[in-house]
Amino acid sequence: MRLTFAMFVARLAGWTSHTLLGKSGETIAGRVLLVLCPNAISQLSVGRKIILVSATNGKTSTTRALAGFMSTAGSVTTSKSGSNLARGVASALMTKSEYAVLEVDELHLPFVVDATKPKAVLLLNLTRDQLHRMHEVKRVADRWKEMASKSDATFIADIDDPFLNYVLASASNNVRVSFGGMAGRHPDGAVCPSCGAYLDWVGGMYSCICGLTNQVSDKKFSAESAAMRNQILANITAEYFGVPWHEVDLSTLERKVSKKFINADCSIRLTKNPASWREALAGVEGEKVILILNSREVDGIDTSWLWDVDFSGLRGKHVVVTGERGLDLAYRLHVQGVLAELVPDFDSATAKFAGPVEVLAAYTAFFELVG
């Protein structure tokens, strides 16, 4: 009775938020549900096949692809907005279905695994994110390792990431996937997360005196990009449930939006941490670029991570910088020999251009621009 009442009020709150404020309504619905019925996630997970997806980067696009694959096997519930905290999970689970494919924030994953008792957990990568919230990568990996040791779920992960290999070592059921190494050394993988010794890296392959290595795996593939890796991992997860392999247009997995502002035809990419900046910068092909850096809570207040990103590929391009921490970014570019113009806002930035422009936007800026 309590759950039924809580769901009624939550749906009403979500409908009101969507109708009157134009928002998705998922977040407020989940928040209301958990206030009125704190164990709603556990109750709504009973009798369902739950699949969880977590990572530093690529969660939303991979979850979307995996949900599409699973829809050929039965009814599927997933978050439409990418809300990945406990409230987003709760909101998604209010829709009845045979399967639930849910994106989960890295810090919330242990709680959600315990509450939902998933059949499978897909882990894509684990790299440095917002230090004020996530702390160091090893700390998150330790929490995941403890979580995996207590769960009956099958954990599927890319073991070219040494932190995920470390996590899987404690899982009773796992599928270890390798793509023949990373594109270079893991940015946070100088030492072994298991024993603390230096990892021996040869290209993207690693080994340690304690035995941690990606040279031995359950499945081996080749992939040219992070998007392709994630598509393959999603297929492996779906295959675990008997779903046949799907081919996907990789361009649909990118969080990129095209939109016109005045005379500028903008291709807007989301950039939220060092790994996503590196990937986005590698994809910049044009000569006109706008970079936006904010520092609100979800963006990350500490911008020291800018020094972990190589911006040298922007040399010689027409670069305009804006955002709340635009000065920090402009200085970082200056030190690396990238000429950039600092302007007060996005309108001023787009006024500098006509035609195609590539925009790399921080989390809050991205969603303000795409609506």
Region annotations inferred by a language model:
Residues 1-30, 46, 189-196, 210-212, ...:
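ATP-dependent carboxylate-amine ligase
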Residues 132-137, 236, 302-304:
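Short, solvent-exposed loop/turn segments at secondary-structure boundaries
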Residues 124, 156, 230, 234, ...:
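Residue-level signal for inorganic ion chemistry
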Residues 66, 70, 89-93, 233-241, ...:
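Buried hydrophobic packing segments
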Residues 2-178, 185-187:
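Phosphate-binding loop of NTP-binding sites
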Residues 51-72, 249, 253-255, 276-281, ...:
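Short, compositionally biased "basic patch" segments
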Residues 110, 131-132, 165-166, 202, ...:
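Glycine/Thr-rich phosphate-binding loops of Rossmann-like dinucleotide-binding domains
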Residues 173-277:
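Adenine nucleotide phosphate-binding catalytic loops in nucleotide-utilizing enzymes
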